[in-house]
């Protein structure tokens, strides 16, 4: 059944909500919706106390390791961690308390999918795919086609998000995380076509993020996906300075499902 899933987005060691398509290394180009006065552990405890499992902690660029570790200490085994995950550090993050690790960019050296990199990450996790989430965050290319975007969503890769690519990757992971980068942080609604396609293509859990504004969007995702796709709401949440919906309303929505 569709659930609300929260997030902790870390940028320069702080919890922020950003406009996804503007995220490159030049801070002058970065459009930020919100910078939290609270440390990451505050949000980890908030999610833990409200039984919001499956939340993702994303390290957007360098300088976020300590902040991510702080989150994991607040809720060991309760959070997924992504951003800069490779075969060299995947196991280290699980040992530090991550429920699962999330990989994107490492799978696409020079923007091209690498099966050997995927195999290496899984091997580092002793072949335990229950510990692995593949992030197929994407940008729309033309009508109803989406391609995986990496390097903070600035580089379009050679992988189209399609039934074929989903089926090829499912044997290696326990779930997918998909940010619609063109919608991320804009609070202008979800990519309904993408949500619908994901429910048709995926046979394992999948979380969609990007443009979610309120409980109506949760209901829309539930309807479009037949309850198969979860939704992350970020910038619209009251705890991130948003006016669209409160965290408590989302918690209560989950309990009603």
Curated annotation (Swiss-Prot):
GO MF annotation terms: 1-(5-phosphoribosyl)-5-[(5-phosphoribosylamino)methylideneamino]imidazole-4-carboxamide isomerase activity
GO-annotated biological processes: L-histidine biosynthetic process
Origin superkingdom: Eukaryota
Record's keyword annotation contains Amino-acid biosynthesis: yes
UniProt keyword Signal, yes or no: no
A Pfam family recorded for this sequence: His_biosynth
GO CC annotations, alphabetized: cytoplasm
Reaction catalysis annotation: 1-(5-phospho-beta-D-ribosyl)-5-[(5-phospho-beta-D-ribosylamino)methylideneamino]imidazole-4-carboxamide = 5-[(5-phospho-1-deoxy-D-ribulos-1-ylimino)methylamino]-1-(5-phospho-beta-D-ribosyl)imidazole-4-carboxamide
InterPro entries in the record: Aldolase_TIM, His6-like_euk, His_biosynth, Isoase_HisA-like, RibuloseP-bd_barrel
PANTHER family: 1-(5-PHOSPHORIBOSYL)-5-[(5-PHOSPHORIBOSYLAMINO)METHYLIDENEAMINO] IMIDAZOLE-4-CARBOXAMIDE ISOMERASE
Protein family: Belongs to the HisA/HisF family.
Full protein name: 1-(5-phosphoribosyl)-5-[(5-phosphoribosylamino)methylideneamino] imidazole-4-carboxamide isomerase
Species the sequence originates in: Neurospora crassa (strain ATCC 24698 / 74-OR23-1A / CBS 708.71 / DSM 1257 / FGSC 987)
């Amino acid at each position: 059944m569709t659930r609300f899933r929260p997030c902790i987005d870390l940028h320069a060691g702080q919890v922020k909500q950003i406009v996804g398509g503007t995220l490159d290394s030049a801070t002058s180009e970065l459009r930020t919706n919100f910078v939290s006065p609270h440390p990451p552990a505050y949000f980890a405890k908030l999610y833990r106390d409200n039984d919001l499992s499956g939340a993702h902690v994303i390290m957007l660029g360098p300088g976020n390791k300590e902040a991510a570790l702080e989150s994991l200490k607040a809720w060991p085994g309760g959070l997924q961690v992504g951003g800069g995950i490779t075969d060299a550090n995947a196991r280290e993050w699980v040992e530090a308390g991550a429920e699962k690790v999330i990989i994107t960019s490492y799978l696409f050296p020079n923007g091209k999918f690498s099966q050997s990199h995927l195999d290496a990450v899984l091997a580092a996790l002793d072949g335990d795919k229950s510990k692995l989430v593949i992030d197929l965050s994407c940008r729309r290319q033309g009508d109803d086609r989406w391609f995986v975007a990496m390097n903070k969503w600035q580089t379009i890769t050679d992988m189209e998000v399609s039934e074929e690519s989903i089926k090829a990757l499912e044997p290696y992971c326990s779930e997918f995380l998909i940010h619609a980068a063109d919608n991320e942080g804009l609070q202008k609604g979800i990519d309904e076509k993408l949500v619908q396609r994901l429910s048709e293509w995926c046979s394992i859990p999948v979380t969609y993020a990007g443009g979610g504004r309120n409980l109506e969007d949760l209901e829309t995702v539930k309807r479009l996906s037949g309850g198969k796709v979860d939704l992350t709401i970020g910038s619209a949440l009251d705890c991130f300075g948003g006016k669209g919906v409160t965290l408590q309303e989302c918690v209560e929505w989950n309990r009603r499902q």
